[in-house]
């Protein structure tokens, strides 16, 4: 499951960080990460209540106490976090614009956006105006060929847009 590929890049510390999953849908990548990181708090944010209900039901069924759901649009959300994860919820430029306020005050190492995306991202990254670091998921472990064009896109909290 490529949701867990994010674990290769997120910190492995006993410290309790807060991770916001923007456009969480049914809880991916946050639910698998919440299992792996019980010391972290996960804020699942989505504008569609039905999706949040599914994600919360899954979390409740498997006994996760480090997951909370938030029915809101991310751009008007008043929560704070150390990391943002997303699974192709929106174009990178919009994700950056809509989420930077969530990271205010974070002192976590490599605080920023970690987004799972696929395909050729060169145009999307160029249009976003942010400096993005791409990590090919296929290089992190022995993933099947399906993951050859799957990426983790990292944008640091402090990045300044060029456009």
Predicted features, each with a name:
Residues 107-120:
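Conserved beta-strand signature within the Rossmann-like core of class I S-adenosyl-L-methionine
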Residues 92-94:
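Short glycine-rich, flexible loops that bind phosphorylated cofactors or substrates
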Residues 41, 66-68, 112, 133-136:
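Conserved beta-strand segments of alpha/beta enzyme cores
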Residues 120-163:
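Active-site capping/gating segments
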Residues 96-110:
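A short glycine-rich, Lys/Arg-flanked "PGG" loop and its adjoining helix->strand segment in the class I
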Residues 58-59, 103, 125, 129:
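Conserved hydrophobic residues forming the short capping helix/wall of the S-adenosyl-L-methionine
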Residues 4-86, 96:
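Conserved SAM/SAH cofactor-binding pocket of Class I
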């Amino acid at each position: 499951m490529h949701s867990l590929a994010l674990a290769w890049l997120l910190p492995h510390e006993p410290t309790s960080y807060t991770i916001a999953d923007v456009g969480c849908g049914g809880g991916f990548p946050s639910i698998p990460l919440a299992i792996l990181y019980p010391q972290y708090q996960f804020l699942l944010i989505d504008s569609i209540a039905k999706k949040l209900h599914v994600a919360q039901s899954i979390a409740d069924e498997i006994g996760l106490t480090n997951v909370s759901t938030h029915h809101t649009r991310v751009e008007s959300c008043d929560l704070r976090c150390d990391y943002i994860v997303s699974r192709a919820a929106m174009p990178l430029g919009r994700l950056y614009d809509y989420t930077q306020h969530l990271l205010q005050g974070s002192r976590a190492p490599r605080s920023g956006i970690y987004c799972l995306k696929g395909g050729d991202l060169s145009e999307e990254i160029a249009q976003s105006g942010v400096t993005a670091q791409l990590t090919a998921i296929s290089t992190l472990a022995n993933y099947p060929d399906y993951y050859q064009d799957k990426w983790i896109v990292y944008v640091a909290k402090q990045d300044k847009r060029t456009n």
